[in-house]
């Protein structure tokens, strides 16, 4: 089901799809406020990227 341009629905989708961090060493998903990776304990985290087509 495609998302229309309703700003409230779009904000909810963006929060759930892009508001977390990815570990650069093991690739695990982590919460947005994480300092260390939950799986490998590395501090090398990056925010999830948003790419427009």
From Swiss-Prot:
Listed GO CC annotations:
ribonucleoprotein complex; ribosome
Name the SUPFAM superfamilies for this protein. Zn-binding ribosomal proteins
Q: Does the keyword Ribosomal protein apply?
A: yes
Q: Which Gene3D superfamilies match?
A: 4.10.1060.50
**UniProt keyword annotations, A-Z:** Ribonucleoprotein, Ribosomal protein
Any Pfam family: Ribosomal_L40e
Q: What is this protein called?
A: Large ribosomal subunit protein eL40
């Amino acid at each position: 089901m495609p998302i229309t341009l309703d700003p409230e629905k779009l904000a909810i989708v963006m929060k759930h799809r892009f508001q977390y961090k990815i570990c650069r060493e093991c690739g695990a998903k982590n919460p947005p406020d994480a300092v260390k990776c939950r799986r490998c304990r590395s501090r090398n985290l990056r925010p999830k990227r948003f790419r427009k087509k």
